[in-house]
From Swiss-Prot:
GO terms for biological process: glutaminyl-tRNAGln biosynthesis via transamidation; translation. The keyword Ligase applies. The gene is gatB. It catalyses: L-glutamyl-tRNA(Gln) + L-glutamine + ATP + H2O = L-glutaminyl-tRNA(Gln) + L-glutamate + ADP + phosphate + H(+); L-aspartyl-tRNA(Asn) + L-glutamine + ATP + H2O = L-asparaginyl-tRNA(Asn) + L-glutamate + ADP + phosphate + 2 H(+). SUPFAM superfamilies: GatB/YqeY motif, Glutamine synthetase/guanido kinase. It comes from Leptospira borgpetersenii serovar Hardjo-bovis (strain L550). Its EC number is 6.3.5.-. PANTHER family: GLUTAMYL-TRNA GLN AMIDOTRANSFERASE SUBUNIT B MITOCHONDRIAL AND PROKARYOTIC PET112-RELATED, GLUTAMYL-TRNA(GLN) AMIDOTRANSFERASE SUBUNIT B, MITOCHONDRIAL. Keywords: ATP-binding, Ligase, Nucleotide-binding, Protein biosynthesis. GO terms for molecular function: asparaginyl-tRNA synthase (glutamine-hydrolyzing) activity; ATP binding; glutaminyl-tRNA synthase (glutamine-hydrolyzing) activity. This is Aspartyl/glutamyl-tRNA(Asn/Gln) amidotransferase subunit B. The keyword Zinc does not apply.
Length: 486
């Protein structure tokens, strides 16, 4: 049986989160009534001239810098000509041979692997989005409606080299790309709202061959899971075709998420089919190096850089660092809490386990979480300073969720400070030993885990307020002085 190698390249369209459209002053707010965010430019009315949105240009440059691209100091816009109901001008303003960014790449790590992988980028170019067709849900009314609110929304198209060899690589590449775009805040990357869309180019070839096979472009991929599933299906289909000695044309397919298969949409057009030519209404763009450096100075610390700092400077485990840097807002929250607590590992545990536990359970973002980073930091500081135990901290956390008080106020009002009175703890320890003779016997016979039952008794009697370290040390001393059980 012949063995084949999968070749994958991805084209990602990311809407830039500007207030207005790329060539007009119309708003870009999602969810507005149909055709309420249009003007003569995005409607393609005669005599309406486009003017480039400077903010869109800056965000495109920032994305290029973040991905390590070369920023073109000379760039221009071109008309991509085709006819479709959601394109009122009969052409799309895009970039053909002089994109704003070239080269660069995306580094990512597949879950469970130690080493990272790198996928090269071909280019990043700017273009305007098309409108949206809304099809009638009633099969007896074969009508489609056009909403041009989205027409003219600024996009960057991020085109990768065909460097990926599996759907897993594509999946984690997309996760890393999305994380970077959100970190630098040029796009909200909300796939449900269509602000991040992906097309996959898939082909196979015999292993060892350096020639590319016939390529299929897959569209209608509205989630990363859909990208993975579509690639897996397409690779299986192409492999079956090859094994049966059949050929097929280069084509565009749609992903049918109901049937879980790719469906042919049309034979693939080549670039000459679009009759690209420079847009005569838009002047060429000549950037100054100072402009690029000004944008570079605004670039925040990127996810991989931040993750490495958390591991190398703060001493966090790699897993913790990956969780905390998955989103910029989470990493910011952690660092703000750390400024108060002073203990990186304890703060990490509380943010990734307790805070994100609530965030995920309630399906909210961390910016919507009711407890500020400073209040969580205050709670962790009480733990780090030995003023409260982990068990008491959970009680305080529950109170933080429903009140505006800080942790120290809650601990004081509820008298939850850890008990360090030697005589009081010794009294409870003696009681625990006397009332847990079975556990004492097991411990003395070498079953160290039996100590937990005795400690649990002490914590129950003290209502969780006894100093755990003092309890453990006192128990070990007292049990060590007892004769071993026969």
């Amino acid at each position: 049986m012949a063995e084949f190698e999968t070749i994958i390249g991805l084209e990602v369209h990311a809407q830039l989160n500007t207030e207005s459209k790329i060539f007009s002053t119309s708003a870009t707010k999602f969810g507005s009534p149909p055709n309420s965010q249009t003007n003569p430019v995005c409607l393609g009315l005669p005599g309406a001239l486009p003017v480039l949105n400077e903010s869109a240009l800056e965000k495109a440059i920032m994305a290029g810098i973040a991905f390590g691209c070369d920023i073109s100091l000379f760039t221009k816009f071109d008309r991509k000509n085709y006819f479709y109901p959601d394109l009122p001008k009969g052409y799309q303003i895009s970039q053909f041979d002089k994109p704003i960014c070239t080269g660069g790449g995306v580094t990512f790590t597949i879950k469970g692997e130690e080493s990272s992988r790198y996928v090269r980028l071909t280019r990043i170019h700017m273009e305007e989005d098309a409108g949206k067709l809304i099809h009638s849900a009633d099969p007896n009314i074969p009508q489609s409606y056009v909403d041009l609110n989205r027409a003219g929304t600024p996009l960057i198209e991020i085109v990768s080299e065909p460097d990926m060899r599996s759907s897993d690589e594509a999946y984690y590449y997309l996760n890393s790309l999305k994380s970077i775009l959100k970190y630098i805040r040029v796009s909200d990357c909300n796939m449900e709202e269509g602000s991040l869309r992906c097309d996959a180019n898939v082909s196979i070839r015999p292993k060892g061959s350096d020639k590319f096979g016939t390529r299929v472009e897959i569209k209608n991929l509205n989630s990363f899971k859909a990208v993975k599933a579509a690639i897996d299906y397409e690779v299986e289909w192409q492999t079956e075709m090859a094994l049966e000695g059949k050929t097929f044309q280069q084509q565009t397919k749609l992903w049918d998420s109901v049937a879980n298969k790719t469906v042919t949409m049309r034979t693939k057009e080549m670039s000459h089919d679009y009759r690209y030519f420079p847009d005569p209404d838009l002047p060429v763009i000549i950037l100054q190096k100072e402009t690029v450096e000004s944008v570079r100075s605004k670039l925040p610390e990127l996810p991989n850089e931040r993750k490495n700092r958390f591991v190398e400077k703060l001493g966090l485990p790699k897993y913790d660092a990956e969780v905390l840097t998955a989103e910029r807002e989470i990493a910011d929250y952690f660092e703000d809490a750390l400024k108060v607590s002073g203990d990186a590992k304890k703060t990490s545990n509380w943010v990734k386990d307790e805070v994100l536990g609530v965030v995920n359970k309630e399906s909210i973002t961390i910016s919507e979480f009711s407890v500020s980073a400073q209040r969580i930091g205050g709670l962790v500081k009480l733990i780090a300073d030995g003023k409260i135990s982990g068990k008491i901290a959970k009680t305080v956390f529950e109170e933080l969720l429903i009140s505006d008080k800080d942790a120290e106020t809650i601990v004081t009002e509820k008298n939850l400070i850890v008990v360090r009175d030697d005589k009081e703890i010794e009294r409870i320890v003696n009681e625990a030993i006397a009332n847990n003779q079975d556990a004492v016997a097991k411990y003395k016979s070498g079953k160290d885990r039996a100590l937990g039952a005795i400690v649990g008794y002490v914590m129950k009697v003290s209502k969780g307020k006894a100093d755990p370290e003092l309890v453990n040390q006192m128990l070990l001393d007292k049990l060590g002085s007892l004769p071993p059980k026969e």
